[in-house]
């Protein structure tokens, strides 16, 4: 992903840019911001220019808007968008007497000790920059960078330290780790997916791309939206 982004930028500077470039989701804000600089032609703009009929409403709103500018016009074409999901091991939940999968972090905190007492890891996640940074800001409707998240200008700084909700969340993660409610097994994606796949953890935050492989090894699990802080969203 990073190599392709760098190669695309280098090719443009050399005057030998490709007609199209598949850019990963983390680079979307950069591409959207470059429309105003004349580097990128937005998808909807190009479709209108060449008389191509496009109904942007055919896309799931959350995915469409991720690749759109601040006016809601699609700049990129969602091709194989990865979605962050919470996987739940229903056998573990049944064993410890939990009937409902939590929707909020507050609900998770209420059941985490019960899971830990049974000898399981309550929660794992596989990619903090995506799951507990990018998706955290998005799910809680918070700005992650200046420049209106890159929609109005190329971002010059992140707003991590200035965002009280984000600081609170990571303080909670530290607390969960110390209590044994959150497991961290290494930087690699598979380091944290493997304990869930092996039946050692109740919940795992990962990608929709793992669903097919998971079905072949874990008999009883569900996929759910990632958790959110009710105290931040007001239940929305």
Feature locations, PLM:
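Hinge/lid segment of periplasmic solute-binding proteins
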Residues: 27-84, 103, 109, 135-137, ...
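Structural recognition of the beta-strand scaffold that forms the well-ordered cores
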Residues: 19-23, 75-78, 85-87, 122-125, ...
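Extracytoplasmic/periplasmic solute-binding protein
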Residues: 68-79, 84, 109-158, 201
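Glycine-centered hinge/linker elements that transmit conformational signals in sensory
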Residues: 112-114, 154-186
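Extracytoplasmic/periplasmic substrate-binding proteins
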Residues: 21, 29-33, 135, 171-236
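Non-transmembrane alpha-helical segments in soluble domains
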Residues: 9, 44, 90, 109-116, ...
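Extracytoplasmic "Venus flytrap"/periplasmic binding protein-like
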Residues: 1-59, 91-96, 100-103, 193-195, ...
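Solvent-exposed loop/turn segments at secondary-structure junctions
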Residues: 2-3, 25-30, 82-85, 92-93, ...
């Amino acid at each position: 992903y990073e190599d392709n982004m760098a190669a695309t930028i280098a090719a443009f500077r050399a005057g030998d840019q490709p007609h199209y470039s598949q850019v990963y989701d983390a680079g979307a804000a950069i591409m959207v911001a470059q429309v105003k600089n004349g580097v990128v032609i937005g998808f909807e703009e190009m479709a209108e220019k060449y008389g191509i009929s496009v109904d942007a409403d055919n896309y799931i709103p959350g995915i469409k808007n991720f690749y759109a500018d601040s006016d809601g016009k699609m700049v990129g074409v969602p091709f194989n968008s990865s979605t962050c999901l919470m996987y739940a091991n229903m056998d573990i939940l049944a064993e410890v007497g939990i009937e409902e999968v939590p929707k909020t972090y507050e609900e998770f905190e209420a059941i985490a000790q019960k899971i830990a007492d049974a000898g399981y890891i309550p929660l794992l996640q596989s990619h903090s920059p995506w799951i507990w940074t990018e998706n955290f800001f998005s799910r809680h409707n918070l700005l992650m960078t200046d420049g209106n998240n890159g929609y109005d200008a190329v971002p010059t700084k992140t707003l991590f330290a200035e965002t009280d909700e984000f600081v609170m969340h990571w303080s909670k993660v530290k607390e969960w780790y110390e209590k044994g409610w959150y497991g961290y097994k290494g930087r690699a994606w598979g380091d944290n997916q493997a304990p869930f796949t092996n039946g050692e953890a109740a919940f795992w935050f990962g990608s929709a791309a793992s669903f097919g492989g998971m079905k072949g090894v874990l008999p009883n699990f569900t996929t759910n939206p990632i958790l959110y802080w009710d105290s931040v969203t007001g239940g929305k």
